[in-house]
């Protein structure tokens, strides 16, 4: 009889080697497939483009805040008449930049409102993208509103300074005028107050007259700035009214959610209490002490 033990051992080694190589190949293939996998949500909206626009808009609002701050710092002190022409030129440049930036930000905020409504229709009001857009719009709109209120207060304070300066110069020259007369003069455009007849009527120097004329020009420029921004403030007030309704709806939703959570807590408490008093549970605990110990 032929001894085939060596042949069997050789065959066994070959089978083991082939099995090991097959297992390693399978693991490599599985690992390769796993590395290529990625979690993809086909219906999830992409918010990167919205975030890019929001970041750009936020930078514009920050630049507007810086310009308003510069404008306010220039109004803290009255500059001498020798520097007043250069000051008026700088103020005119800053106010033009503020107007352009404010109009751009206002248009961008309106576009963001349209994106919010579009996201509500496509993704639903409770989707992540919709909530992000709403919160970002509310925060940036509130910041923009505060900046424009500060700018408006600065212009109003500058007007009062100019009126006070004109009244003081006229009092020094011996010409008594009330604040109402100055306001009427500015609104009606009575330029004859600053002509040569006033110079001959009272003892006023040409330097004082030049000071008054410069202050009057500043007031006229401020009036024009306020007229330019009037439409913008009207749009802001309309947006405030719309935001007020949204805030009321959010408050009602939060209150109803709070009541629902409280009711749920009470129901959970009753459920736990009834579970402990369940007679079947007590009977099982007496019959099966091992289960109760677990």
UniProtKB/Swiss-Prot annotation:
GO terms for biological process: exocytosis; intracellular protein transport; synaptic vesicle fusion to presynaptic active zone membrane; vesicle docking. Keywords: Cell membrane, Coiled coil, Cytoplasm, Membrane, Transport. It holds the Pfam family Syntaxin. SUPFAM superfamilies: t-snare proteins (SSF47661). GO terms for molecular function: SNAP receptor activity; SNARE binding. Its main location: membrane. Residues 209-271 form the t-SNARE coiled-coil homology domain. One of its GO terms (cellular component) is plasma membrane. It is a peripheral membrane protein. The keyword Transmembrane helix does not apply. It is found in: Cell membrane; Cytoplasm. It comes from the Eukaryota. PROSITE patterns: SYNTAXIN, T_SNARE. PANTHER family: SYNTAXIN, SYNTAXIN-19. Interacts with EGFR. Plays a role in endosomal trafficking of the epidermal growth factor receptor (EGFR). Belongs to the syntaxin family. This is Syntaxin-19. It comes from Homo sapiens.
